[in-house]
């Protein structure tokens, strides 16, 4: 168990100063360098005399200087707001307007001119590092102080800043490094793929820094080159893979993504979206000896609140894979529309309680009051997810409340339809979306389909392919759930965080 993130990093700077903490295609930085660089950057930040505990926006990609700046800000007593280099200018402006940061640190060239907020450039960070300024920690982030603030997409289009405290982070990190499901080794060698602006990134950097491991990052230029990206990943000595399931699906398009070519890769950690039976089955075929961990949780409950090791037996017997045993310190409940706790097996909304629950959304008391509350004397959060608990306290996922539609008198989970279609042996990926009429009622269901390699060539017309897919799933899919139209694509759009972008597809079919 660790009691302070920075104390842990500082300890490794003493005991394994020359061990790499960061590796980008062979360009390495050690724990000793991270201490010296973060001390120097923290001294620079202190010299600016910012308002105590005020948040600082950090703009950049998956670089070492981002990591060193995050550590420096924690030492200096400031929460950091990670903003990815690929963010749209409108989103950056919205984040600045809401967060009111006292400073912007631009590790990459900042695309906007902001009046009234000082900006520190990469050249100033580099100069501070060269100066090697000593630093005495007297006011670092502690306890309920905000450690980081990650902005998620709001339903109104306005992003919401989720405040995660040092205590929240410790609750998550200690669970992850101690829980048998994750089985994190000492000095873990982790792939650092999800951007820092996505809280899934915490699942790789927090346990790695807590256990003295190495982060293997990829340069941003590589991420846009699909073929080169996965050729490079296959050559990395990573032992643990952390990503959304969608990113793993992309990786499996490369023949090099297999146990024979990547023998060091033994653990897969998934979070951020639902892990399908189809993806898990394919992964077991590629990596027969690997451990596949399915984790679940919203950003508001610090990355994940439950986890479970997926077995071949689960893949063979479940239509939707379980999402885990809740964390011991985070009692999780299922409630009905009136807020009453439901019994085992009953489906309702998943709520999470305990020390990993955020204090709320930054400078947004209205949205905070809607989502955060007290349950059984504990801080609690409405996940907006449908689920149930088995008698063995395993959490089962049933979809999103906001992706639940009423069609032809039936209440339908869009994700349930997608899961059923994904069971077809011809389908690589499927997403169900509703088309609305002028009265905003569901007119019909459509499905976006990516078929497996070689499937299209077996059919003369798409109509015949559609009939074949429908026939392949009709035995386990209710007729009223079957989409009336299938739209075939070579790929499905992903959000910057690597999830399938369902909202974009819904907007597309409704001409929004």
From Swiss-Prot:
ATP binds at residues 152-153, 294-299, 385, 397-400, 499. Keywords: ATP-binding, Cytoplasm, Ligase, Nucleotide-binding. One of its GO terms (biological process) is lipoteichoic acid biosynthetic process. Its main location: cytoplasm. GO terms for molecular function: ATP binding; D-alanine [D-alanyl carrier protein] ligase activity. It is found in: Cytoplasm. It catalyses: holo-[D-alanyl-carrier protein] + D-alanine + ATP = D-alanyl-[D-alanyl-carrier protein] + AMP + diphosphate. It comes from the Bacteria. The keyword Cytoplasm applies. Signal peptide: none annotated. D-alanine binds at residues 199, 303, 499. Catalyzes the first step in the D-alanylation of lipoteichoic acid (LTA), the activation of D-alanine and its transfer onto the D-alanyl carrier protein (Dcp) DltC. In an ATP-dependent two-step reaction, forms a high energy D-alanyl-AMP intermediate, followed by transfer of the D-alanyl residue as a thiol ester to the phosphopantheinyl prosthetic group of the Dcp. D-alanylation of LTA plays an important role in modulating the properties of the cell wall in Gram-positive bacteria, influencing the net charge of the cell wall. Belongs to the ATP-dependent AMP-binding enzyme family. DltA subfamily. This is D-alanine--D-alanyl carrier protein ligase. The lineage of its organism: Bacteria, Bacillati, Bacillota, Bacilli, Lactobacillales. The gene is dltA.
